[in-house]
A protein has these predicted regions:
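N-terminal, polar/charged subdomain of small-to-medium soluble alpha/beta proteins
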Residues: 1-111
Length: 111
């Protein structure tokens, strides 16, 4: 089983419940795991998952609209990655570092 990890993908987003979060934006950190079966073990690029495309899908979801809740944002990323790559398992963690005090994160997954 091959698992692709995209870690610490930092993107500016306008997500949150409060008006200032939507107006000013803030950093969100994405960690993605995709179990892609045996894709890529034959060393053929055509059979592998393009890592850049994984990050592009995450960025597209992040930029497409504003979400009030991290739960909805994380699930939207899971849905988009599932549709694009059809992995055997997927896990997306979205972290919102600018929460006082500390950091908040939400994980959405689908086997």
């Amino acid at each position: 089983m091959i698992t692709i990890h995209v870690e610490d993908l930092r993107l500016l987003g306008r997500h949150g419940v409060h008006a200032h979060e939507k107006e000013n934006g803030q950093e969100f950190v994405y960690d993605v795991e995709l179990d892609v079966g045996e894709r890529g073990i034959d060393d053929r690029i055509a059979d592998a998952v393009d890592y850049r495309e994984v990050t592009r899908v995450v960025q597209d979801v992040n930029d497409a609209r504003s979400y009030d809740l991290l739960e909805a944002l994380a699930t939207a990323v899971v849905d988009a990655l599932q549709e694009r790559f059809a992995p055997e398992r997927i896990r997306v963690r979205v972290t919102k570092p600018a929460v006082e005090p500390g950091t908040v994160s939400v994980t959405s997954s689908r086997p």
